[in-house]
Amino acid sequence: MTAHIAGTQIPAGCGFSTVLPDLDFETYSEAGCIWNGTSWVAPIGATKKGIAAVGAVVYSEHPSTEVLSLSYDLKDSLGPRLWIPGMAPPVELFQFIQAGGLLEAWNCIFEYWIWKNVCTARMGWPVMGTGG
């Protein structure tokens, strides 16, 4: 029933808002990079570095990968929220996900793998379904 509105954007301020609840991770990782003594460079034979060199799954599984922040908006009239490590877990987001709520993300595959391999596996957050 809500599939037809997925991706819909509504003008808001100087940007756009989505119709469905959404989330976005900012992360750090040394995956797909090599330290050459002065800077991080692409691995030998690769033309790119970081996630572009290894892909979302390998990036999310790398032991150095960490969440720097999580922004989310449940479209519940409370507005966008920001979670950073050290804060209390985002319980209202957990409840929304556990109730089967649908979420949008700019790069949903990346967000899914970070949730699964960093947040669930390392931080004990609940499992996120795939909507399928």
Feature map (PLM): residue ranges:
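Conserved DEDDh/DEDDy metal-dependent 3′-5′ exonuclease domain
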Residues: 3-4, 20, 43, 50-132
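N-terminal accessory regions of nucleic-acid-interacting proteins
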Residues: 1-33, 37-44
